[in-house]
């Protein structure tokens, strides 16, 4: 279990084992059951949404989760289904890892070239993604922390003039360890 805030505006609680996630931004709160889409719930200003806007909010929350969780834990996603990995040579005959996402998420086909340090920790990446008109844009992995559960995550990513900060990182083996009641996801059982 993990909770985090992305770019000071998207707050997440993710139970990866049970495939449930909550996403809060502004006055919106969405609970997604990643195994059973129709069980997802959404509210605006604490008022449950049940009309056509429910699917719009679930879709937006899912897209945000795919993007923001990538930036949060990308090194842990390289062995997901639909991901290919290849060692390639870059300048000075240094090895780099080319990671391509052929399926899953909301932007299949995106590729990232990861440049690693001597301990194989990502230093920076170059990306070729569908949402950007030019390829090879460089971004960084900075300010690494080790969580209570011993996961290592970079909390700063600089991409051109944009800096994305990941904050409020909390991990645990159950919801109570991250400060939430164990019934937190019962709304989408």
Question: Residue spans of the language-model regions?
Answer:
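Gly/Pro-enriched, hydrophobic low-complexity segments
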Residues: 94-183
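Residue-level detector of beta-strand structural context in well-folded domains
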Residues: 2, 10-12, 21, 83-86, ...
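Flexible, processing/modification-adjacent segments and terminal tails
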Residues: 41-108, 132-135, 187-189
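Short, ordered beta-strand-loop transition motifs
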Residues: 15-17, 87-95, 147-149
């Amino acid at each position: 279990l993990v909770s985090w805030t992305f770019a000071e505006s998207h707050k997440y609680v993710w139970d990866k084992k049970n495939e449930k996630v909550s996403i809060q931004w502004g006055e919106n709160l969405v609970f997604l059951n990643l195994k059973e889409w129709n069980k997802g719930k959404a509210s605006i200003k604490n008022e449950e949404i049940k009309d056509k806007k429910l699917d719009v909010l679930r879709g937006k929350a899912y897209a945000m989760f795919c993007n923001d969780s990538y930036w949060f834990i990308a090194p842990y996603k390289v062995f997901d289904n639909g991901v290919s990995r290849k060692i390639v040579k870059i300048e000075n005959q240094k090895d780099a890892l080319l990671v391509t996402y052929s399926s899953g998420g909301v932007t299949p086909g995106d590729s990232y070239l990861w440049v690693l340090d001597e301990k194989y920790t990502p230093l920076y990446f170059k990306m070729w993604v569908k949402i950007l008109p030019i390829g090879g844009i460089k971004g960084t992995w900075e300010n690494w922390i080790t969580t209570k559960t011993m996961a290592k995550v970079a909390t700063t990513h600089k991409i051109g003039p944009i800096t994305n900060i990941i904050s409020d990182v909390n991990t645990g083996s159950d919801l109570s360890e991250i400060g939430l009641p164990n019934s937190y996801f019962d709304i989408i059982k």
